[in-house]
Structures are given as C-alpha cells and as structure tokens.
C-alpha cells in the first residue's frame, strides 16, 4: 500500500492499482476550476413556508387572480423547484413543489418583481407577513427574494446536485427548474457530458474521498472541492455521444444504461480490463 501525501488537503491511502488509475485520470484531465463553467447555490427564500408551495396552493392562488392577464403573469412567476432530496442518479423525482419567484431583479438587465402586479400572490404572502418582514434573506421589499445575480442561469442547461449527500447523485436539467438552497447547479460547457462523468463509477472510485465525509457517511459537495477535480475535455463528436446517452437514461433509467456509460468512460480513459474490474459498478440507488 502507498500513502499519497502529495497534496496538503488530505492524506489518502492508495493501493498501487488505485494509484495507477487515479494518475491516469489526473494526467489527461483539466481541473474544473479551469473549465468554462459556473457553480452556484440554489435560491434562498428566508421563509420556505411562505415562498415554497405545493400544486394545491398554486392552483388556489391562480384561482384567486381577478383577470386572465394577472393569472398568466402569476403562472409564469410560480416556478417548479427541485430540492436536494429530489435528486437521483441522472434523474430527479419532482415533489410537486413550486417557488414563488418574486425575484429582486438583476441590475441593468432585469427589473425586480413588483408585488402590486400580483394581488393574489400578495394576499398569500401577507398571511406570513410577521415572518417575512424581518427575515435576513430579502430583497428591496419583504415580498422580494434576496439578490441573485445568477438567476438567469437557472434557465440554462445545467447540472443539479444536492449540497449534502451520501450517494453523490447528479441530474441534468435543460432549464425548467429552479432549485432550493439544498442544491447546487453547474452551467457552462459540456454539462451533459460532465453529468455523465460525475455519475460514473470512475468518478466515485477516484474522487469520492476528495469530498469531506460528515456524520453518517454524508459528504459535503462544496465548490472548493469540485474546483480541483480533473476531467478530460472531449471533442464535440464525443460530447454528442454522451449527450445522447444522458438523454436516453433520463427517458428511462436502468442500471444497465448506467453501466454502459461507465464503459464509455473506461474506454475514453484507456483503462485496462483489470482496472475496469477493480472499479466495477458503484451503485448509488
């Protein structure tokens, strides 16, 4: 057994073959901090019980709108939201919850939401006035969410993952969902391919211990740890193969499809049959 003391961050005990596999990955990979990607935290409301609602409450708010114009505006304002617990390997289990996205705007690009334009939403939030008026996470008014300069990134293709997790699942979203503060998102280049890599057994085998383990086996997936992960950048032709594979597995998840994507990475990194056998398939279900 070999002790790898090469980084000041952690000491990891590696067998010779484990060290061989990890060196292969690191030799050809580019640290994620040098990729054209952004990693952001989900939306903070300061009062989830007021701003995060189920479909029944959403329908009630829409029914209380006085005009079709108000109803249409309100329907656009209330967005589906994913929470950390909803994220699975490649897929997500949306829990029928919505965010009242009374955002605070983006300076020079997007005007903040004016609650006077949404009377039915205001009536709902007024029920929580004592809780929302003094909360720390608020915008220009208690009705507004705090500033979020990257709000538009939620509408882009993105990776979504929980900030605390035992199983390290990652899913891919084309832009339909916002996320709560228990999630992070990654936007930028090669995000479908990167989703596949982060879900792969290869990633978990090599880099699971790069993320600190907390009580109960939970790991903290903070940006500072992702920055150091080296990942091979690929051509658009190879990227397309992974885009198609991710799309297919999201249509109907099976462990066989996940194993097939694992094999794609084994081939991409030119791992030997013995190295592939050592890694195996790391299930997270």
Where are these predicted regions, by residue range?
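Non-catalytic DNA-recognition/assembly elements of restriction-modification systems
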Residues: 7, 21, 28-36, 120, ...
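Polybasic, glycine- and aromatic-enriched phosphate-binding surface used to engage nucleic acids
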Residues: 2-237
